[in-house]
Curated annotation (Swiss-Prot):
<dbReference type="GO" id="GO:0016405">
    <property type="term" value="F:CoA-ligase activity"/>
</dbReference>
<dbReference type="GO" id="GO:1900796">
    <property type="term" value="P:terrequinone A biosynthetic process"/>
</dbReference>
<dbReference type="InterPro" id="IPR020845">
    <property type="entry name" value="AMP-binding_CS"/>
</dbReference>
<feature type="modified residue" description="O-(pantetheine 4'-phosphoryl)serine">
    <location>
        <position position="631"/>
    </location>
</feature>
<dbReference type="InterPro" id="IPR045851">
    <property type="entry name" value="AMP-bd_C_sf"/>
</dbReference>
<feature type="region of interest" description="Thioesterase">
    <location>
        <begin position="700"/>
        <end position="961"/>
    </location>
</feature>
<feature type="domain" description="Carrier">
    <location>
        <begin position="595"/>
        <end position="673"/>
    </location>
</feature>
<dbReference type="InterPro" id="IPR009081">
    <property type="entry name" value="PP-bd_ACP"/>
</dbReference>
<feature type="active site">
    <location>
        <position position="774"/>
    </location>
</feature>
<dbReference type="InterPro" id="IPR036736">
    <property type="entry name" value="ACP-like_sf"/>
</dbReference>
<dbReference type="GO" id="GO:1904091">
    <property type="term" value="F:non-ribosomal peptide synthetase activity"/>
</dbReference>
<keyword id="KW-0596">Phosphopantetheine</keyword>
<dbReference type="InterPro" id="IPR029058">
    <property type="entry name" value="AB_hydrolase_fold"/>
</dbReference>
<dbReference type="GO" id="GO:0016740">
    <property type="term" value="F:transferase activity"/>
</dbReference>
<comment type="function">
    <text>Didemethylasterriquinone D synthetase; part of the gene cluster that mediates the biosynthesis of terrequinone A, an antitumor agent. The first step in the biosynthetic pathway for terrequinone A is formation of indole pyruvic acid (IPA) from L-tryptophan by the aminotransferase tdiD. The nonribosomal peptide synthase tdiA then immediately converts unstable IPA to didemethylasterriquinone D (DDAQ D), via condensation of 2 IPA molecules. The symmetric connectivity of the 2 IPA molecules is thought to arise by head-to-tail dual Claisen condensations facilitated by the TE domain.</text>
</comment>
<dbReference type="Pfam" id="PF00975">
    <property type="entry name" value="Thioesterase"/>
</dbReference>
<protein>
    <recommendedName>
        <fullName>Didemethylasterriquinone D synthetase tdiA</fullName>
        <ecNumber>2.3.1.-</ecNumber>
    </recommendedName>
</protein>
Length: 970
């Protein structure tokens, strides 16, 4: 085939003074004082300096670790080792440790795991087979998915904590690390192309390939300040960080800044502050982040404070991963220019793992795209070391004409040569003459610039994160949404220039009467909640007619045909009818902000949940919990409200659980700011019920808190229950923190009858469904008994990992034990770490210095998590007191009587209670049979006693719960 006009001649750039990246690190360590500047979570705007690790220190630490890996036989020459961490610094240190030990690091992170347990198992099995049963290095907090493996041939996970704690072998401890001199064709890393669906491909990266890429990237960029550092917030399992920032900086002999992604994604203006403080010469900012930064700067909000004297003269913005809207680039260029940013600061690029990140660059954005009136910025021309071509769709052996859409292919010394241990995928990925098929549709304009024009794959790309349409279809099906016809969901992505990123489109066949606006609104709201839960984005929802959604003879909907029909306007009438009906219903039911505080709070909620500011489908009376907000969203919303409005009495997390609407939070602010009158205090009535999910037509689910008394643990679970309301009980006494006369329960009988009465007030008639987590399991049992004594039917009584006989455990939970359990339960420290402080806590307690005990423990907990929760030391003291009081009520509790049926959810037991699940069930949980008249069933769930509702397990837990409710006729 004749070469394309856009091909670039082979690389002829000067060589580096080393031939591999190991020597590059040695060179940087020996000849520079540069290194890694690490920002820990929530530390950008604090006075504490970031952590600095010089390349010299990195080399020494990695060499020491490499020696340990060899001593403990965890790494051998050319063996593959998974480097699996959340922290960038952990990933960096252990990447080099494996490499210096002669192994091949394969970098992964917790983000590779699906919430579906079957997908996780399948993914790990696939990795084990592909990577030849590798060892995995990780931290204790990340072990859970590896411990779930059931296959015989599984990945063996080891924590680096164990490795570093192991004694050195005496006769080899002083032996020097074998000298490592890799050849240019040796692998330096394996990077995964995908991960959540079990079909990951491993891309080998070689020393020769990376050095060629760095020469090309440097030539294409021609940085004005080449000695200034790089900055990355991307996880280290992506080439955009490992290669394009971390190793590139080392090879270039310059420093690098590593920042946690959440800090910048919540507040992109901080990225500008870091660029100015460190005179950063190169960083990455995809379109969705550019758009968010633009909105911040244009808003002029005092929440987004820029450093005085902000200077962006060194700036060079790599942008890619999704199409860049030209209008966003133009607007942001103007804003950044005020602070010295150079013209054409944006460098839209095309890159993949297989091409070592960006390899085709547009160096004239936005000026070129503005002049050409491009809706989306072009991707420019290949850098040295890469050639590109577009081949015709109908005749792949022929090159497409300028402007003609075809298949994008690339080749060159930067491009990988094949997938690791996957000859079939390699054969499919390359043409007969050795060009790599990217899987993208594209065209090259008359000036030789690349433009992407769709994808051959159906992957949905939201804010740079990819989702599989069939997974969203399945989630909608599993939600059993009233008003939607089963098996008639079709999801895909769509986008126009008004959007920052792609949007999920959901087409569905309604089962309600077309004139029923309320049913239409309820159905659409449920669909939005399900999609938001999975993608953190708000979908475009279009109900269609039966004739619009024909099925094939195999019962399938054609995603491609439906997407084409939508984009061609064939469903415009249905969209208009739906929009008018939704608007009509909202006008009847929605309320607008009535005070400045309500308006501000509503804006904060919308921004946090990524709801467009002009989208009036969410109002001041709508619950944050009803649209898929996670527990971390609640924390962020409270933090942002307090920071923006600076009330005299800051909102607490408990306020949002009490009333999760913008209006309710505004009332809480006003109430907290005003002095508490005697009349207000005297009229306070304790309400134990928190509404976690108000929607659905089936019998409500009632959830009883664990021993800590709070309901935050149920928030993520409630998002997965979309077919029925979900209510949770919150213990009595928390409102005392707000100065209200609310005292804790004085007896179990008071607790039981209070919760029974609250259920009857909101749900006068059965059948009832009630479950309790840990301590709450006992309460659920007793409340169910009271309901049955009144003649009501309880079809589901659930005990989540609690046996009937608990008084001995309750007697063990003295005050210091309650402190330890609370701090572990809310994520302030690990259980192991918390127990090391037990003797000191006992001393404080004996001296009646309980507040000092809380202050002491605070010094040893996760400071970032403490700030996230936003609670005071006095509040934790109150909370511990409530938990201790409540559990002390049960020190003489003896179960008696019976309920008709019970379902016991079984998680891993506490280590000091039972040795394993079999022992736990046979020795303790099976005793429930004595207190159930007809039917007690046991259901295994993933995770342990304190983690079974964690994010990685909650979807599977919800699936089990839904099945149980269905089996019980609910």
């Amino acid at each position: 085939m004749a070469p394309s006009k856009t091909e670039i001649a082979p690389l002829r750039a000067a060589k580096y003074p080393f031939g591999n990246i190991v020597d590059a690190l040695r060179h940087a360590a020996a000849h520079t004082d540069e290194g890694i500047i690490v920002y820990h979570p929530n530390s950008i705007s604090t006075s504490s300096p970031p952590q600095t690790v010089s390349y010299k220190d990195l080399l020494h630490q990695a060499e020491a670790n490499a020696t340990r890996l060899l001593q403990q036989k965890l790494c051998s020459p050319k063996s593959i080792v998974l480097v699996h961490f959340e922290s960038a610094l952990d990933s960096i240190v252990w990447y080099w440790s494996v490499l210096l030990a002669g192994g091949i690091p394969a970098l992964t992170g917790p983000g590779m795991f699906s919430q579906n347990p079957a997908d996780r198992e399948r993914h790990l099995r696939h990795l084990s087979e592909t990577l030849n049963s590798p060892v995995c290095l990780t931290r204790p907090a990340l072990l859970a998915p590896f411990e779930e493996q059931t296959a015989d041939d599984r990945i063996k996970a080891r924590t680096v904590d164990e490795i570093l704690a192991a004694p050195e072998i005496a006769d080899v401890a002083d032996a020097p690390l074998p000298a490592l001199t890799p050849s240019s064709t040796d692998m330096l890393a394996l990077m995964l192309t995908s991960g959540s669906s079990g079909n990951a491909k491993a891309v080998p990266l070689t020393h020769q390939q990376l050095l060629a890429a760095f020469r090309g990237k440097s030539t294409a960029a021609s940085l004005r300040f080449p000695r200034s550092p790089f900055l990355s917030w991307v996880h280290m399992d992506h080439v955009a960080n490992l290669v394009h920032c971390h190793i590139f900086a080392i090879v270039s002999g310059i420093s690098q800044i590593q920042v946690p992604a959440p800090d910048l994604l919540i507040n992109p203006a901080q990225l500008l502050n870091l660029i100015s403080r460190h005179r950063v010469s190169r960083t990455f900012m995809p379109n969705f982040l550019c758009a968010k930064l633009r909105r911040q700067l244009e808003s002029g909000s005092p929440e987004y404070i820029l450093d005085p004297g902000l200077n962006l003269e060194t700036l060079y913005i790599d942008t890619g991963g999704e199409a860049n809207v030209t209008e966003v680039c133009i607007a942001l260029q103007s804003l950044l220019s005020r602070y010295g940013a150079p013209d054409n600061v944006f460098k839209p690029s095309f890159g993949m793992t297989e091409t070592v990140a960006g390899c085709i660059f547009n160096s004239h954005c936005p000026s070129y795209d503005h002049a050409q009136r491009h809706e989306f910025a072009c991707l420019g021309k290949p850098m040295p070391g890469v050639r590109m071509r577009v081949t015709r769709l109908d005749t792949p052996s022929e090159e497409a004409a300028p402007g003609e859409r075809g298949s994008l292919e690339v080749t060159g010394e930067v491009v990988f040569k094949g997938y690791y241990n996957n000859p079939a995928a390699t054969a499919e990925a390359f043409t007969s003459d050795g060009w790599f098929r990217t899987g993208d549709l594209a065209f090259i304009d008359s000036n030789g610039n690349l433009h992407l024009d769709g994808r051959t794959k159906e992957m949905i790309n939201i804010n740079g994160v990819k989702y599989l349409p069939y997974e969203l279809d399945a989630a909608l099906e599993q939600a059993q949404i009233p008003g939607a016809t089963p098996s008639y969901f079709c999801t895909f992505s769509s986008r126009d220039a008004t959007m920052d990123t792609e949007v999920v489109v959901v087409l569905y066949l309604p089962s309600y009467v077309e004139s029923d606006d309320e049913a239409r609104f309820s159905t659409q709201s449920s669909i939005i909640r399900v999609v938001a839960m999975h993608t953190r984005s708000r979908p475009r929802v279009v109900p269609l007619r039966p004739q619009d959604m024909p099925k094939s003879t195999l019962g399938k909907l054609s995603r491609a045909k439906l997407k084409t029909a939508l984009e061609e306007g064939q469903f415009a009438t249905q969209q208009q009818i739906n929009d008018e009906a939704i608007r009509r219903y909202q006008q009847k039911t929605r309320a607008s902000p009535e005070t400045p505080d309500e308006a501000v709070i509503l804006d904060i909620i919308k921004e946090q949940l990524e709801i467009r500011s002009d989208d009036d489908s969410f109002g001041v009376n709508d619950s944050i919990l009803s649209i898929g907000a996670t527990s971390m969203d609640l924390v962020a919303i409270i933090h942002r409200i307090n920071k923006c409005l600076q009330p005299s009495q800051p909102l607490r997390l408990t306020d949002i659980l009490k009333d999760s609407t913008a209006r309710g939070l505004a009332v809480a602010l006003a109430t907290g700011a005003a002095p508490r009158s005697q009349d207000q205090s005297s009229t306070h009535v304790y309400d134990p019920v928190v509404t976690l999910q108000p929607h659905g037509t089936k019998s409500p689910l009632w959830l009883v808190h664990p021993g800590v008394g709070e309901v935050l643990v149920f928030v993520n679970l409630a998002h997965h229950i979309t077919d029925r309301p979900v209510y949770a009980f919150r213990a009595k006494g928390f409102n005392a923190a707000a100065g209200l006369p609310e005292t804790p329960f004085t007896s179990l009988e008071e607790l039981f009858t209070t919760y029974r009465d609250a259920i009857k007030e909101r749900q006068p008639h059965g059948p009832y469904a009630i479950a309790g987590y840990s301590f709450g399991g006992m309460v659920a049992f007793e409340v169910s008994k009271l309901l049955e004594q009144d003649g009501d039917e309880v079809r589901y009584c659930g005990s989540w990992n609690l046996p009937p006989h608990i008084k001995f455990r309750m007697r063990e939970l003295v005050w210091e034990e309650c402190v330890i359990h609370l701090f572990y339960f809310v994520g302030l420290m690990t259980e192991l770490a918390a127990y090391t402080h037990k003797p000191t806590l006992q001393e404080f307690n004996r001296a009646n210095r309980r507040l000092d005990a809380i202050r002491y423990l605070r010094q040893h907990c996760d400071a970032a998590r403490w700030d996230e929760l936003g609670l005071s030391e006095e509040y934790y003291l109150l909370w511990v007191g409530l938990a201790s009081n409540m559990q002390s009520l049960a020190v003489d509790y003896e179960p008696s009587g019976s309920v008709k049926c019970m379902d016991v959810f079984v998680a891993d037991p506490l280590s000091h209670v039972a040795k394993d699940r079999i022992d736990w069930v046979e020795g303790r949980l099976s005793a429930w049979k004595e207190f159930v008249r007809e039917d007690v069933r046991f259901h295994d769930v993933q995770g342990a006693h304190y983690t079974m509702l964690n994010r990685e397990y909650v979807e599977a837990f919800a699936g089990t719960l839904k099945n149980v409710l269905r089996e019980r006729g609910l």
